[in-house]
């Protein structure tokens, strides 16, 4: 399967396309081109429905990418409040530190996200 097409669907919120990839055997925990997992791309781009679907299909909520960034940190860095809320509600580890040595709470100035992380 073509990573670029799958990554495009993840980033752009094409849930039907993502479902098709998974139905055809795409591993929701496979490291894609770029050293990231599907959950990272969805979290980075604020794709809440994609996040929910991938988690339902067994995506590892705390999987680090090649930079040791978790999906929660990805959502925090990009300011996606709804994604942060979902990931926390599903058990994301908020104590993990990013490559800068900061936790998600320490890495954001977004007050809504800080409130969720407290």
From Swiss-Prot:
N6-acetyllysine modifications at: 4, 11, 24
Sorted UniProt keywords: Acetylation, ANK repeat, Cytoplasm, Nucleus, Phosphoprotein, Repeat
Induction (record text): Up-regulated in heart left ventricle of patients with severe coronary artery disease and history of myocardial ischemia. Up-regulated in heart left ventricle of patients with dilated cardiomyopathy.
GO CC annotations on file: cytoplasm; cytosol; F-actin capping protein complex; nucleus; perinuclear region of cytoplasm
Placement of ANK repeats on the sequence: 2-30, 34-66, 67-99
SUPFAM superfamilies: Ankyrin repeat
Any Gene Ontology biological process: regulation of striated muscle tissue development
Family designation: Belongs to the myotrophin family.
Name used for this protein in its record: Myotrophin
Annotated source species: Homo sapiens
